[in-house]
């Protein structure tokens, strides 16, 4: 893991985050020799992650999700694959043939206008700074980490530029005059500290019920859902969210007001010239 980070990992946007997770995983596995690691060993490790016998954060004390464990498997497998490409590893990848958990397409929750009002009011009562983080997420579709890591240099007049993003591309999103002024009224270069547990505490007191694992991401889903329901363009949404693959953005396409209804207007019979429509209806060959 140290060699992977030195030769490759430190160049990645999330390299330090992945390295920290890998170190925790290695310790939980008992720090075996790399040549002794087997798929059987990892299978027992991930079983303990699922049950919560092994956990790295209080929020996962009841057990990590299959999605998280699949991600951890990818991290560790990538260490061997990358070192092999670099000529530093000459043995087989011990996780190469290990199947990941099958993940069903999950429900994507989003907030209604009434729920947004309730959430913002409760956040403001808890801490106005927390409410501002939530507003930034709802106004821009930002990921939670992008919002809480926001710095003064990223905010220009009526615009926020998110940098060091998951997609590795900077993206600039317009914001309202009111939100801009609220952000710029804060002191310091770094505006926020991570208020995840504050947000968790507030959400538990609201009437809002969310699928597991969507606590902060529901804000991003809410932006995307309302964007599409208001007639927004799917390609514009892809750029705003910073998705590399349009398939990620297409998850929201069904929320567009004209989704599928275009089949009624744009099918080949509907687009026939009017005279041909009549002929087609009565079975006459033009």
Each model region followed by its residue ranges:
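C-terminal secondary-structure termini that scaffold catalytic or DNA-interacting sites
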Residues: 267-286
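N-terminal DNA-binding recognition helix of tyrosine site-specific recombinases/integrases
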Residues: 21-24, 32-40, 51-98, 142-145
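A Lys/Arg-rich helix-loop hairpin that forms a DNA/phosphate-binding surface
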Residues: 13, 26-51, 91, 188-193, ...
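Short, basic/aromatic-rich helical patch in the C-terminal catalytic core of site-specific tyrosine
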Residues: 42, 76, 80, 147, ...
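Short, aromatic/basic-rich helix-turn unit that serves as a nucleic-acid recognition element
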Residues: 1-22
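Short, polar N-cap/turn motifs at the start of nucleic acid-interacting alpha helices
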Residues: 153-159, 232-251, 262, 285
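Basic, Lys/Arg- and aromatic-enriched nucleic-acid-binding interface segment
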Residues: 62-66, 70, 85-144, 148, ...
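Short, basic (Lys/Arg/His-rich) helix/loop patches that form interaction surfaces
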Residues: 32, 121-131, 140, 173, ...
């Amino acid at each position: 893991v140290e060699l992977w980070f030195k030769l490759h990992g430190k160049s990645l946007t999330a390299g330090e985050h992945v390295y920290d997770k890998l170190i925790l995983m290695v310790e939980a596995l008992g720090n075996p020799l790399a040549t002794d690691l087997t798929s059987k060993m990892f299978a027992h490790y991930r079983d303990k992650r699922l049950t919560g016998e092994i956990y790295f954060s209080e929020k996962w004390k009841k057990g990590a999700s299959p999605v998280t464990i699949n991600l951890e498997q990818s991290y560790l497998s990538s260490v061997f694959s990358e070192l092999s490409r670099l000529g530093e590893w000459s043995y087989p990848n011990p996780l190469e043939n290990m199947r990941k958990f099958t993940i069903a397409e999950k429900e994507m929750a989003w907030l209604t206008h009434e729920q947004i009002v309730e959430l913002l009011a409760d956040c403001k009562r808890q801490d106005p700074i927390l409410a501002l983080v939530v507003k930034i997420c709802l106004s821009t579709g930002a990921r939670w980490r992008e919002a809480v890591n926001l710095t003064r240099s990223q905010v220009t007049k009526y615009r926020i530029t998110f940098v060091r993003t998951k997609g590795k591309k900077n993206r600039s999103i317009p914001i309202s005059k009111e939100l801009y002024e609220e952000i710029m009224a804060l002191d310091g270069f770094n505006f926020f500290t991570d208020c995840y547990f504050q947000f968790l505490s507030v959400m538990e007191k609201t009437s809002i019920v969310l699928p597991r694992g969507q606590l902060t991401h529901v804000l991003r889903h809410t932006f995307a859902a309302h964007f599409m329901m208001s007639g927004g363009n799917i390609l514009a949404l892809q750029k705003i969210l910073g998705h590399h693959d349009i398939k990620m953005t297409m998850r929201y396409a069904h929320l567009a007001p004209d989704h599928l209804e275009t089949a009624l207007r744009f099918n080949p019979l509907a687009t026939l010239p009017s005279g041909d429509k009549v002929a087609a209806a009565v079975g006459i060959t033009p």
